[in-house]
C-alpha cells in the first residue's frame, strides 16, 4: 500500500487504493522503512543495526516524529560510544539534538591533539564548539606546564626522615625528571592518570627521598588536586555548550499514547 524512494507517482486520486497504486513517500528510503518495521515489531537482523542504520533511524525519527526510533538509535549510539571518535559523536549530537553523551564526548575530545582531528570536522562541529575546544586546549596546556614545574609541597617530613634538606632537594629533582617529563613529553605527552601510573612505578629510584615521605607524597599526587580545576573546567565548558547549542525535541507521542488520546 506504500512505496518508498523515487518510484513514478500513480494517477492522481488512485494512490493507496491497491498494491498497484501505492502511496509514494519520496523522503523515505527502503532501508529507513525496513528499519521502521524493525522498530515497530522489535525484530532485528541477527547482526543488529549498523552505524549507518542508526543514522537512518535518527533521520527517520526527525522526519516522522517517531520517539521509539529516536530512543533506540540513541541507546545504540550510547552503548557503542567508545567505538566512535568523540568528534563524530559530537557532530551527531549537534545534528540530531542529542544531549545524552555530548558532555562525555567533549571530555574525550579535549584529550586529542588538534592536528589529529580531521579538517572537515571543524565545520561540522561549528564555530562555538571548535573555538571553545581550541581555547580550552590552550588553557589546559598552560595549566599542565605550571603543574609540571611546581612539585606538590612537602609540608612535613616523616619522623624517620633524618635529612630533611636532602629529601626536599631530591623530591624537587625527582618531580622535574619524571612527572614533568611524562606531562611535557613533546612526542607523547601523557594525561594525568597515565603520568601518575608511571610516576608511582619509580619504586626505589627516588634518590635521597625518605621512603615514608615518598609514600605520603605519592598519596598527595594520586589525589589529583592539582588537576581537579582542569577537569572541572572541561566539564563546565561542555555543559555550557550543550545547554546553549542543543534543544532536545519535545517528547513525541507513541502509538499507544496516540490511540489513548484519540479515544478520549
What are these regions (language model features)?
Residues 1-47, 171, 183-264:
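BTB/POZ (also called T1 in voltage-gated K+ channels) oligomerization domain detector
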Residues 14-19, 24, 55, 81, ...:
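Residue-level signal for the start and early helices of compact helical domains
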Residues 70-197:
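Alpha-helical protein-protein interaction/assembly modules
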Residues 28-125, 229, 233, 239-241, ...:
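Post-BTB helical module
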